[in-house]
Design a protein with these regions (language model features):
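Positively charged n-region of N-terminal signal peptides that target proteins for export
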Residues: 1-4, 18
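Sec-dependent N-terminal signal peptides
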Residues: 4-13
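Single-residue recognition of alpha-helix boundary sites
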Residues: 13-14, 109
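Sec/Tat signal peptide C-region and signal peptidase I cleavage site
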Residues: 16-22
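A contiguous strand-loop segment
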Residues: 23-121, 141-201
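Second-shell loop/turn segments in exported
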Residues: 113-115, 123-132
Length: 201
């Protein structure tokens, strides 16, 4: 009887389980790595992303050029924003300046989304990689894009690194709240699929 009860409890537990869809990043600062490198790993828990390696070549644009924004997850056209005069070469999640941006999604309440926003988390990553040289510049670029054009995704934690520094930046809901924290020199950090920053300034 005890075995049967245990089996029934286990079956109930398993029947309520959801499959995991959890991106995970590991961030290692130059002071914590053996050779002084910044390292960011990115495990996107999605069967459709295995082997993806996106390429955006460096380019020059005339004054007044516009960039089309397409929602990263759905492929839906969202709108246009002004393009900058020069963009950097991007392969995967790293640009020619060794700036890396990865993400983990922790979601949020459905009513916190901004249907008027033009920038989703994927567009934010790749536009920023094309426009920024350093982690600090990336944080500034991301904040400006969200402030100017609105943020349409849920809660996201971005792992941002250049050869000298490692940062975690988080955006929540409508893009009204955002925060960034510098990872100290000799640290290894796991950035799971959850909000890590608790106080936003």
């Amino acid at each position: 009887m005890k075995k049967l009860l245990t089996l029934l409890v286990m079956m109930c537990v398993v029947s309520f389980m959801k499959p995991a869809q959890a991106c995970t990043n590991f961030l290692i600062t130059p002071g914590a790595s053996a050779d002084g490198s910044s390292i960011v790993s990115y495990a996107a828990d999605s069967h459709v992303l295995y082997g993806e390696l996106y390429h955006y070549p460096a380019a020059d644009y005339p004054e007044g050029a516009m960039r089309e924004i397409v929602d990263w997850d759905s492929g839906r056209y969202v709108g246009r924003i002004p393009e900058v005069a020069h963009t950097y070469n991007v392969v995967g999640n790293m640009n020619e300046w060794q700036l890396v941006i990865a993400e983990t999604t922790y979601g949020g309440l459905p009513n916190m989304g901004n249907p008027e926003g033009l920038i989703d988390y994927g567009s934010l990553i790749y536009i920023t990689l094309q426009r920024s040289k350093t982690a600090r510049e990336a944080i500034k670029t991301m904040a400006e894009l969200v402030a100017n054009y609105g943020y349409m995704s849920d809660g996201e934690s971005f792992s941002i690194a250049d050869p000298n520094e490692v940062w975690i930046m988080e955006l929540i809901g409508k893009g009204q709240e955002k925060g960034a924290v510098w990872v100290p020199v000799c640290y290894l950090v796991e950035n799971p699929e959850c909000c890590c920053l608790r106080i936003f300034h």
